[in-house]
Amino acid sequence: MTITKAHALIALAAEAVLPLADCADPTSSSNGSNGGASAAGTSAATTSYDVSQIPTDEEIAALVPAEVKARGILRNGASADYAPAEFLADDLQTAQGYDVDINKALAKVMGLNDGTTNHAEFPTIIPALGTKFYVGISSFTITSERVAQTNMISYVEVGSAFGVAAGNPNNFDPTNPCGTTIGVQTGTAQEDYATELSAQCVADGLDKITIIPHDQQTDITPKVTGEQYDATFADSTVIGYTVTLSGGQMEQVGEVVESAPQV
């Protein structure tokens, strides 16, 4: 999760709820949101982690800024198109996922009434911290650039993986992606990594990778299954979940790479 320097007390609250990450359903449901997309355009049964029994930590609650305490709400910004971490239910309004449940649990520890999650395009979340949102829990890979802007508290380590249409009809080779077309979400670590791979291809005298960024990860899946893109590159959790819900239309190729702490 990412938080502004002024709201660093959330780091303390995070310590109290991190064990939930080990037992929460990765398709858990939570609070309302606007925008985003349902997971891979398919339905999946979801079960929210029950945070009702999580006690308030009075020491932490005493540190909550007056503005946050007055609202009684821990406002989270997330790109609600990145299942199973954060995505929308079939009503296209209700945010769900393990990051969403973590935010609700944090709110309980801080003595607040609720933790809400609203959709925002991924690159806009960090600039909105401290104004529109109090916290950003949205599958951020920790980088030096992001740490310069926010405090970042990791509670999970996630890698990256490639997803292709079932049967890999375009013969995408994850060990040699030069000359291919790859869809990524804008502003992600995968976009940066794919850019580095493409530069290496050119340096080696090979064709560059055509990298096509999208604001929403869910927009990429039909491009892959329709063979417009050779592959998509995303968090390994996202690729695995997309494959599971794709009804046999998608598969993962290659190993998980670039495993890193995430918030």
Where are the predicted features?
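Bilobed "Venus flytrap"/periplasmic-binding protein-like clamshell domains
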Residues: A83, A95-K108, F140-T143, G159-Q216, ...
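Short, hydrophobic alpha-helical packing/hinge segments within bilobed ligand-binding/sensory domains
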Residues: I102-N103, T124-L129, D219-K223, Y229, ...
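Periplasmic-binding protein-like
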Residues: V156-V164, T244-V263
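Alpha-to-beta junction loops
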Residues: L112-N113, G130-S139, T225-A234, V238, ...
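Sec-dependent bacterial lipoprotein signal peptides
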Residues: M1-A21
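Bacterial lipoprotein signal-peptidase II cleavage site
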Residues: L20-A37
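Acidic, polar ligand-binding/catalytic clefts
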Residues: G115-N176
